[in-house]
Amino acid sequence: MPKPKNEGYLGNINVKRQGVSEEWTDDKVQEYLKCTRDPSYFISTYLKIISLDEGLVPFKLYDYQQNLIEHFNDNRFNIVLACRQSGKSITVCAYLLWYLLFHPEQTVAILANKGATAREMLSRITTMLENVPFFLQPGTKALNKGSIDFENNSRIIASATTTSSIRGLSVNLLYLDEFAFVENAEPFYTGTYPCLLYTSDAADDPAS
């Protein structure tokens, strides 16, 4: 379904700007509820990724990727040890986007050993967002290389792993990429963990 040009965010017709109303049908409501309840369904039905061989293609999850998503959704803490080019990072990006779209008032942080790595993941999330139908997008208030703010008051930030990366923030979901290569990992962890520990929803949120 084509997206109205005048409803896009700052000239990007594929990202819905804030303040755009949606005409809800019974089918849209049912589909929205289904996506809310099942991240794997939302990802495999609506998200697209860039393939080196085929360009933009639907994100068809392998069994192990579905298992990853289930673990993310069912457990507060997750550690993933996997080989390179196994599709783990793109799976994380897809899960984070689902979490942001269907969970209002949440703050998500992507931290990596290099700021460029974290921003690259945010860029992948933006590409996925651009292919989501408008009725599933909450509307975007701000979008740049380092963060996205949605109309449902959820937001995501990308930064390097330093002790002050997310200081002062209350983070509902934190993703640490390339953590094996983080220098001074212990002071970083002790400086970052309270941002999760003192988040009001953290104790109840299995995805944090």
Regions found by a protein language model. Give the residues of each.
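Phosphate/NTP-binding elements of NTP-utilizing enzymes
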Residues: 2-200, 208
